[in-house]
Regions:
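Conserved N-terminal helical subregion
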Residues: 2-10, 22-24, 49-187, 235-236, ...
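Glycine-rich active-site loop/strand segments that organize a redox cofactor
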Residues: 45-46
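Conserved mid-domain beta->alpha element of the FAD-binding
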Residues: 8-29, 33-36, 154-155, 180, ...
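Alpha-helical, largely C-terminal catalytic domains
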Residues: 336-337, 345-385
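Conserved FAD/dinucleotide-binding core of flavoprotein oxidoreductases
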Residues: 90-100, 104-109, 143-148, 185-271
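Histidine-centered metal-chelating micro-motifs
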Residues: 160-161, 179-181, 209-213, 300-301
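Short gly/ser/thr-rich secondary-structure transition/capping motifs
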Residues: 40, 136-138, 205-206, 274-283
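Acidic/histidine metal-binding catalytic segments
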Residues: 71, 120, 256-272, 331-336
Length: 385
């Protein structure tokens, strides 16, 4: 392409930054607008596994695979399943042979940010509205000021995207599942017994219509999610989040009767206890192409986290849009080609995520999880053979 559009990317998450990096490598100028005040303004979330065919592929396209290897935790891919009495039902502690290593979200963001000139990103820009102009371009209106014009506005601004309404009237719907997030700091030194319980990876516990996933992160941190099938506003009514001590006690009370070593994970948690209701767009969400507007990642296809595809799909979106823009003679056709491919590509992971959230906390308890873990282990062994 000899003439590139003026490109605004809304959101400095993995998708937005991956797109900016790939285009920067190709000599295409972009501007990334991020509502956070700076890179460390808030925690970026827990750990995630990057898949060879999506997240890792995107980092290869971005020229950051070696940097990825420096932050990849191949040793933290184990899985254990316990019942509420603390009995170990399944263990796969040799998963470091898998090709989907764990990566902390903050570390991933750091390598992406380090690969870009600082002046590409405009921090503290909270988008309020995208307004079309008479000449076909778009102006951006932020909480404090405006920017533009831009020929192409890419919404990489997450589940509650401010760009999405320009192409779609759909909004994410509550899945029926809510997480309560908690964490344990310096676990190896302060709580070695809990470090041993979790091991090098994650544990799952499910019984009595509720569950818990607890996972090792980097820097000796453990992050946990208590899982409930409840109304969307349940957590804010049931917990006093303004008082971490109260919230911690209330959370432990929800698991009364469970093994002390499981409850100890909650009792040892720090003061960062928050509600995370799970929302998703309809499976097959798509829109009619609108010149100058497109979406990446959760803005396009937010799905439940149970399939582990969210960030991976988002980064592959970025890689594919970047490739189309760099290879196509007409940027408008590039966007159309990206959207057509993306709509089909995300169908399968979205269906799997929807099925997973629908069956989470079923009457079968841990039985479905046990079947899943065994099938995953068998598939990995057959692939290795």
């Amino acid at each position: 392409m000899t003439s590139y559009p003026r490109i605004a990317i809304i959101g400095a998450g993995p998708a937005g930054l991956t797109l900016a990096r790939i285009l920067h490598q190709g000599g295409v100028k972009t501007t990334v607008f991020e509502r956070e005040e700076h890179a460390l303004a808030r925690p970026q979330g827990g750990t995630l596994d990057l898949h060879v065919e999506s997240g890792q592929l995107a980092l290869r396209h971005a020229g950051l695979y070696e940097e990825f290897l420096q932050i990849a935790r191949y040793e933290d891919q184990g899985s254990r399943l316990y019942d509420k009495n603390g009995t170990l039902l399944f263990a796969d502690d040799e998963a470091d042979e898998s090709d989907r290593p764990e990566v902390d979200r903050t570390a991933l963001r750091e390598i992406l940010l380090a690969s870009l000139p600082a002046d590409i990103i405009r921090w503290n820009h909270d988008l309020r509205e995208v307004c079309p102009r008479d000449d076909g371009a778009y102006d951006l209106f932020f909480e404090h000021g405006t920017a533009g014009p831009f020929d192409l506005v890419v919404g990489a601004d997450g589940s509650w995207s401010k760009v999405r309404p320009l192409v779609s009237h759909y909004r994410p719907q509550y899945s029926g599942i809510s997480f309560i997030e908690f964490g344990i700091d310096d676990v190896d030194a302060s709580h070695p017994e809990l470090a041993a319980l979790v091991g090098r990876g994650k544990i799952s516990v499910e019984a009595d219509g509720r569950g818990m996933i607890v996972q090792r992160n980097g820097n000796a941190h453990i992050r946990g999610y208590a899982i409930f099938r409840v109304p969307a506003d349940w957590a804010n009514k049931a917990f006093d989040f303004a008082s971490p001590a109260s919230a911690r006690a209330q959370l432990a009370a929800e698991f009364e009767g469970w093994a002390p070593k499981i409850l100890a994970l909650i009792h040892a948690s720090n003061d960062h206890i928050v509600s995370r209701p799970i929302y998703a767009l309809p499976v097959g969400h798509r829109w009619q192409n609108r010149i100058g507007i497109t979406l990446l990642g959760d803005a396009a296809h937010v799905m439940s986290p149970f399939g582990g595809e969210g960030v991976n799909a988002a980064m592959l979106d970025a890689a594919e849009l970047g490739r189309q823009l760099l290879e196509n003679d007409d940027w408008r056709n590039a966007v159309r080609a990206y959207e057509a491919e993306m709509f089909e590509r995300v169908m399968e992971p979205a269906e799997h995520a929807a099925e997973a959230v629908a069956t989470e906390l079923s009457h079968l308890g841990a039985e479905l999880s046990l079947q899943h873990y065994k099938a995953h282990l068998e598939a990995r062994h057959s692939t290795a053979a």
